[in-house]
């Protein structure tokens, strides 16, 4: 029985450690990435996984060492895993609609070969023109915010 308890505690410690490592990687991504979309992606995807691993590790530890299941931890787990992706999506959506700057490596126009609207009345040239106008708005907004 003692060996089983030690193995379960080791599994819980490994999960907590992995959760903290993933949170560290997430924070590095927040510092390293250049625009709001990449930062939002780094914050929501990896922090959701890190919180999941950390809280599941804590739940396992409490069950094995204390012998009870914490309802607060389960509620925190559910709440964070529901609200973090939704919040990240809303931030990205608001940034996209306001024309926030999108980082890219090449100077080729973005989204010129992708349908940008579900309307069948738009021609390819109209969609291409709208993509170019959107890219110009984003570039001007970025330059205005960063005083270029």
Curated annotation (Swiss-Prot):
Alphabetical keyword list: Antiport, Cell membrane, Ion transport, Membrane, Transmembrane, Transmembrane helix, Transport
Disulfide cross-links: none
Predominant cellular place of this UniProt entry's protein: membrane
Keyword ATP-binding: no
Biased composition (Basic and acidic residues): 127-148
Record region (Disordered): 125-148
GO molecular function list: sodium:proton antiporter activity
Protein name: Putative antiporter subunit mnhG2
Organism of this sequence: Staphylococcus saprophyticus subsp. saprophyticus (strain ATCC 15305 / DSM 20229 / NCIMB 8711 / NCTC 7292 / S-41)
């Amino acid at each position: 029985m003692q060996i089983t308890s030690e193995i379960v505690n080791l599994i819980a410690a490994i999960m907590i450690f992995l959760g903290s490592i993933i949170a560290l990687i997430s924070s590095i991504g927040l510092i390293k990435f250049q625009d709001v979309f990449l930062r939002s992606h780094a914050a929501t995807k990896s922090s959701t996984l890190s919180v999941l691993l950390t809280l599941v590790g804590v739940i396992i530890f409490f069950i094995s060492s204390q012998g009870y299941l914490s309802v607060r931890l389960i509620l925190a787990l559910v709440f964070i895993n529901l609200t973090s992706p939704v919040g990240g999506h809303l931030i990205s959506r608001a940034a996209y609609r306001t024309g926030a700057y999108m980082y890219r490596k090449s100077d080729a126009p973005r989204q010129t070969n992708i349908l940008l609207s579900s309307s069948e009345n738009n021609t390819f040239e109209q969609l291409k023109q709208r993509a170019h106008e959107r890219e110009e708005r984003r570039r001007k907004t970025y330059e205005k915010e960063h005083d270029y």
